[in-house]
Amino acid sequence: MRLFAGIAATAILIAACGGTAAVSTPTPTASPSPTPVPTVANTFKAELKAANENPPITDAEATCTGTATVTFTATSAKFDVSITGCPATTAINIGHIHEGAVGVNGAVKIDSTLKAGDITLTGGAVTFSRTNSAADPAIITAIMANPAGWYVNFHSTAHGGGVIRGQLTKA
């Protein structure tokens, strides 16, 4: 009987306090989702001309022209290139982005990954794309800040220093 009286007294006390004998559990809260990292994509263009080379091209390959569209992400550079007007014997071997203002020759900073023999001009023209997936983010940032300080340059067998060149501009 004493046991019954003790249980009854405890139940009355709990009821008087407005509580229940059940233990409350906290409501779980959802963890916040990680913030997605934005993908930076910026597109630049260059009008490629033999006359832009330093020194300018004055032989038969002076007729070569083209356009390059370069699209950057945080760590890559995609080159979309069209070259026209070249003599049938022209062989475009390599291409890249150099640091340098108009009329100033500078160091290669981002390679297009084009290698000798990768492309063949037909009727003096070619269109191709290449992507460098390992471009230096610091160089990409510098190009975005001042595209005029950078140029696209494609080289031929006859002109190892470059046959067509153009400064980058925001597309």
Where are these regions (language model features)?
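Bacterial N-terminal signal peptides that target proteins for export
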Residues: 1-7
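Metal-centered catalytic cores of metalloenzymes
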Residues: 7, 12-13, 17-95, 99-171
